[in-house]
Amino acid sequence: MEDRRAEKSCEQACESLKRQDYEMALKHCTEALLSLGQYSMADFTGPCPLEIERIKIESLLYRIASFLQLKNYVQADEDCRHVLGEGLAKGEDAFRAVLCCMQLKGKLQPVSTILAKSLTGESLNGMVTKDLTRLKTLLSETETATSNALSGYHVEDLDEGSCNGWHFRPPPRGITSSEEYTLCKRFLEQGICRYGAQCTSAHSQEELAEWQKRYASRLIKLKQQNENKQLSGSYMETLIEKWMNSLSPEKVLSECIEGVKVEHNPDLSVTVSTKKSHQTWTFALTCKPARMLYRVALLYDAHRPHFSIIAISAGDSTTQVSQEVPENCQEWIGGKMAQNGLDHYVYKVGIAFNTEIFGTFRQTIVFDFGLEPVLMQRVMIDAASTEDLEYLMHAKQQLVTTAKRWDSSSKTIIDFEPNETTDLEKSLLIRYQIPLSADQLFTQSVLDKSLTKSNYQSRLHDLLYIEEIAQYKEISKFNLKVQLQILASFMLTGVSGGAKYAQNGQLFGRFKLTETLSEDTLAGRLVMTKVNAVYLLPVPKQKLVQTQGTKEKVYEATIEEKTKEYIFLRLSRECCEELNLRPDCDTQVELQFQLNRLPLCEMHYALDRIKDNGVLFPDISMTPTIPWSPNRQWDEQLDPRLNAKQKEAVLAITTPLAIQLPPVLIIGPYGTGKTFTLAQAVKHILQQQETRILICTHSNSAADLYIKDYLHPYVEAGNPQARPLRVYFRNRWVKTVHPVVHQYCLISSAHSTFQMPQKEDILKHRVVVVTLNTSQYLCQLDLEPGFFTHILLDEAAQAMECETIMPLALATQNTRIVLAGDHMQLSPFVYSEFARERNLHVSLLDRLYEHYPAEFPCRILLCENYRSHEAIINYTSELFYEGKLMASGKQPAHKDFYPLTFFTARGEDVQEKNSTAFYNNAEVFEVVERVEELRRKWPVAWGKLDDGSIGVVTPYADQVFRIRAELRKKRLSDVNVERVLNVQGKQFRVLFLSTVRTRHTCKHKQTPIKKKEQLLEDSTEDLDYGFLSNYKLLNTAITRAQSLVAVVGDPIALCSIGRCRKFWERFIALCHENSSLHGITFEQIKAQLEALELKKTYVLNPLAPEFIPRALRLQHSGSTNKQQQSPPKGKSLHHTQNDHFQNDGIVQPNPSVLIGNPIRAYTPPPPLGPHPNLGKSPSPVQRIDPHTGTSILYVPAVYGGNVVMSVPLPVPWTGYQGRFAVDPRIITHQAAMAYNMNLLQTHGRGSPIPYGLGHHPPVTIGQPQNQHQEKDQHEQNRNGKSDTNNSGPEINKIRTPEKKPTEPKQVDLESNPQNRSPESRPSVVYPSTKFPRKDNLNPRHINLPLPAPHAQYAIPNRHFHPLPQLPRPPFPIPQQHTLLNQQQNNLPEQPNQIPPQPNQVVQQQSQLNQQPQQPPPQLSPAYQAGPNNAFFNSAVAHRPQSPPAEAVIPEQQPPPMLQEGHSPLRAIAQPGPILPSHLNSFIDENPSGLPIGEALDRIHGSVALETLRQQQARFQQWSEHHAFLSQGSAPYPHHHHPHLQHLPQPPLGLHQPPVRADWKLTSSAEDEVETTYSRFQDLIRELSHRDQSETRELAEMPPPQSRLLQYRQVQSRSPPAVPSPPSSTDHSSHFSNFNDNSRDIEVASNPAFPQRLPPQIFNSPFSLPSEHLAPPPLKYLAPDGAWTFANLQQNHLMGPGFPYGLPPLPHRPPQNPFVQIQNHQHAIGQEPFHPLSSRTVSSSSLPSLEEYEPRGPGRPLYQRRISSSSVQPCSEEVSTPQDSLAQCKELQDHSNQSSFNFSSPESWVNTTSSTPYQNIPCNGSSRTAQPRELIAPPKTVKPPEDQLKSENLEVSSSFNYSVLQHLGQFPPLMPNKQIAESANSSSPQSSAGGKPAMSYASALRAPPKPRPPPEQAKKSSDPLSLFQELSLGSSSGSNGFYSYFK
């Protein structure tokens, strides 16, 4: 029995402790320890060593608790040292495991509580409590971690944990791929993480690996569940799967079927205005002849709880018999009714809907009569008010425009007189001018990783300049046209009230502010805080004719006052006289705000004043000692209200100056008494001799508080030495200052202004109180450093470090510096994303907090909060303050609402046009309703209900306006509604949080941030998702509340998106535990999260566009040329049934783009015609996942189980044909075509791809890709902001500034036979992606073939899976060239139009049928006959210079510079990408380039026509694949065989005319180029001044950062063209361990690969740099899903097998080079082609695996590797260098028009209409960017000599690099001279051979020198021009990517 004694004693000790019998507990502990002592020798009867260790630790902990309670502190401390020493010596993990075990059994709580109480009370007899504090921290960390694990979210994890032994924290929710888990950069680098256990990134490689394992194990479980389910699949799932797999989906499900008439009541789309609503629909189905109804079922899962079948009756029109329907019925099975020979039969079906929350709900009902198609009907209900917020419309009265800044070059500026700027201020403004060149800003210090002692000044100077440019840019967005009321005087009410009178001929002007300029918007905040002058331009009644050479006058006016509603201006005498202004009249003026540069100049000045920055980088190697004595601790003069921690702080501050201390940090959240503590310390310091105190605060109100509440009463009590001097800003209006404070200020005798202090004034006072801004006055008084002995900075966390150091210029090493603040509150706002990345916004307090070790004595946390309820404190303590806070105040709670309460609203967040903000109407109504309810139930204990009682906080201005408006309607205007930024320092009895964001627009990152590059906090993502990702924002908001925090939001989104999801998990779990989770159950949240993560067949897209077979689509587009449109503004997206469910419920999209948040232009496809029957084969199931925001596509049964594939949801309105990524294995299923697979929309963040089931992860081939595209697309579409090419005045809005509106010519497109190719219409409707956002880059799509069906034969180390190849004969040469010549010489001349950007999308369909011609007879609706053969022969080879899919341009006329008769350059209609039939759609997202699948729609042969006839019925919709499948004999380009080069073969590429810098210009064009160019603020491109007058709104231009993004994404990764592929073209040659032979043998001998010959397809045809030689990690080569049709061969195109009797797709043989020589023109870029190969199809094509390097918001450009880019300006595969030269010569001969005979018929589609001019580089998308290999080639790879020669020839002959710079491209990474040489020399030496001319960093710093235009303008020195040169992104406008180049 003895071996159980110790354990028993330990248990008894625990019981005694809980009973508070401490002496007995002590006794039992001692017994247990003594018992354990005897087991120290090897005793086989005793417990095992681990058990001994556990009992020992437990007993010691109980002993410590008992000793503390018995006040035996010394013994407790000794035991504590013992437990820590032993526990940690044996490994911290083991020790923590014991603690976790105790916590799970509930044994840790009593110990932890006692420890916390002991340490937060009085100091333990003055002893040092370092060990006890450390133990307490360990215990609280353990409790936090364990409680998170137990919070209910990870029940399944705990289950797994018990069996699989998981050791780390549970992973974050909402992850849809194990690749999304990341490592926490901050933790790895600094060993601490602000998020603690709540961090969504792993804190070690081991934790990361475990998370990935857990994810995999959950996926396996899901797969098993699916396999089990498959045996007994439900009717609904079977039906959906059948529909998905059907060749003719409309034959499976349809909205109308023959012989059944459907009537419904009410409308299918209903809006209800109350939250608690009930709705029923009755469907009457009249069957003639009579038929049996077998089933009625509801299909859509996500909203199932809200819908049910309530009644079914059957009979004739007069008598109905009710059928039995179970309760909450989801599927009713009938078939038992007798029809008694009736000729007709009527069924009535009742569907009920119930909701108690606001939101949008959808359902699909199917009625199965035993025949197909099955009838379906879709219903939608919107539980939200749809009233327009009229006042918001009213707010649009202020016309906000973007225009050129007014400066002395464009206007005559009349300065305001008298000018009150002091000489010192003038000198500062002059001294700190923004440097004029980039290399002065981008110094090494800015590019350094962090702030150091050595780079301190230079780095902060540069970042301040960069921030100034960003502020300037933000403020430049506003020209306001306003009615200015002229006043002679005005009155202000309130505390700061008083009257002001104009004197000396001056007048006041007043104008009203609207939401546009309130503190709630970014720019508004800037205007309210950083602007003190405006330029004013009178708007004349009639437009005056301006004479040449005269400049308009603008007048400077100063801002006199800013109130919440008005701004008051002071107008100068000269202005009033010249404009003849009179009081009490109105005049219309245009205003431009002028940034006040002075505060930034003062920060520069402060930086230069800091002589010794050692104070700012304290040495922490030696721990300082703060002397302690009982006399000091219990000094009677200390205020008795001070708690222990506050006393500790006072002791540290008042430590004798002889003892040097680093800056003392007093950390504490609001409500812990920081100001009180500092004030007590001041009183104490004044008792020491020779001390002088400087108190600095961030705000005037806080400074006044010291005087009013502390110093004034102290002076009045008889302490004259404490008399403070309050220094105020000299222009502050005296009347606005509190009377008590007046007596401590220096006020001029006239009592009108404050005076600047003189040195004597300072010497007279021992206490000086200033704000950080006014502290600079003291610096100007020549006070010697060290004059103040103590410098106390309050609110130190709210100021940037540059502001905080102003007063520190007066400090020395001996000065006692104290910083008080809350490091977890919001940091100051910085407008420049670049500066934010480099931590310009971080406060000194924040930086030192991280610099000091955890238990540093100068880092004191005040931990008793007196303001909030205990539940609120405990939550914030646990999550934000390491468990150290405790509630000391007694705040009453509400009887009905627990202090943490959650109200569910399932709305959708929307972004308005011209707004960077979001709103969510469902939340607006929920908040208002709950506010009303709370007011009715206001407890007496909460006191009077007044203005400060209820606060509503949200991160977005738009939501603020909407909630205010709704409250106003309910007469609840006393409720405070604010943005979080504006509530710091305020407090409310009740606080409502509206979180706004949902998965509707927040797409979770689909790719990992590069490991170890986890986003840094305060990155763009934080700003972007508000409460979902910025923990400081969340903490700031929650800590405002005293008794109740009520959150209104979408719980699924909160728990699955953003870096705060674990904080929200905990919040919702607490609400659940306390029964305060309303509107959804905890179980539902868990189920939906699991469904979301594991991609069950849970949700399908309710907004799914209707399926129209391709053939019908073509007919329809022929019958209408209506534009696709978005829902009207101000109207609910789901307002009518038409909007939602009919394919022509269409409204015109508004082309305006967001101000400050540009998004991409997007062109919808043509709508379908007016034949409802033909066009109506709508999607039967709602296919949007409400949680991920993605659409979901069922995968056919070959996968086993109802696996679902996520596909992007491009547009949430009707009539838009969906673009879905389809797995190639279901290409055989017509359902794929139902989704218009060839028009595949790029994936975005929101489309998780379930490659987990044995498919390739997103990094399969590792290609960067536009991750943000779909997000933008989604936002844009959702708001109807689609940029369509509207003719008329709106056309201007979608052009870049230099594009003037053109009148599109009406062209008879049908007259060109090529235009009638089946794909020419749908193929061009690609959304442009040239408006990037700030998301991470994603790996690009690569068309990866499916792996072998037998995983066991998978070949390791193989980058690309082998493919079968069959030889295939070449085609005869088509006779199309004459026609082409005719077309290509047909460019219309358009003056005034500069080459268009690839930012928009070609809108060919809209014109395709404008002048219809009688079509020739067709083979099938999908394949038109006749001259269309040209289409089948169209070229499809690698097209090096074609822009990516998204880069196609809306119809625009060709540039003016290329006159019709003289230019060899031709516009090319973009045969739009038929987006990749992704060979594995489980690969990643966003193929931004010309997709590989494009091949499928353009290689068609004459042989194909015959096959088409045979296959017509089956393959009507397969236009792009048919020719392949039927063995059309399009030739493939072959490998290098010089003897075959002469063969005339049809082209396989669309020839792209290269951009030439020296285009032949017409006279008018030349004039235009002569004009000097200035930069335009949001554009990187330049435009001439004459064009600027007509620019569109700045907000609508592509943001500067777009260049950087495309720089990574869009540059082609192949090196320049080579004469013919050298030996390195062998695709296996990249991998050292493979050669062709080995591969052949290996594959050929493998029974699993019967037909697999060496595939020459996937590897790029050039040598890879050495770093890319490694094979990919094994995880990227996961085996694919098994192919289940054993008797069918698996073929790469049709998926594993193709059952339709078509032969397998042949591949090109590896021999025979293929070079086209036709009309003296060599084919461009004949790279080896395979329709599914990943050709270098666009400039964004093929980086190698290693180059996959997405950039997160926190990932600056210069940290990324240089990737290759392509220059294929002239000819890629020319037979000889001479040919190359000849061809390039032709390029330079501008009059030689005949030399450009393009051989691709497709290339001239629609020539005479305005077509894209493809080679114009814009925003980084140029094809002509110089290859990185030429600039800085990888050292290890030397291309073969012939390749180098060819590269050089090409580049040198035809490519002038300056055009890139001139047109807004990136600078070369070598000096211009060198480029010129390489561009004009014809020496065989390639630049690739040389060393890199310039490092990347130096390229960043080097000022790029553009090719000067004929007359180079003098560089403008104003900040805006400079901004455009640097094109830095500002946080709101550019959202985060900036280019560092010109």
From Swiss-Prot:
Compositional bias per record (Polar residues), positions renumbered to this chain: 1117-1127, 1761-1779, 1792-1825
Location of the region described as Disordered in the Swiss-Prot/TrEMBL record: 1117-1141, 1246-1345, 1386-1429, 1527-1552, 1608-1637, 1729-1779, 1792-1843, 1870-1942
Cellular component terms per the entry's GO annotation: cytosol; membrane; nucleus; P granule
Binding site for ATP: G668, P669, Y670, G671, T672, G673, K674, T675
Family from the record: Belongs to the DNA2/NAM7 helicase family.
Annotated function: May act as a helicase that plays a role in RNA metabolism in multiple tissues and organs within the developing embryo.
PANTHER family registered for this protein in UniProt: DNA2/NAM7 HELICASE FAMILY, HELICASE WITH ZINC FINGER DOMAIN-RELATED
Protein name per UniProt: Probable helicase with zinc finger domain
Lineage start: Eukaryota, Metazoa, Chordata, Craniata, Vertebrata
Gene designation per UniProt: HELZ
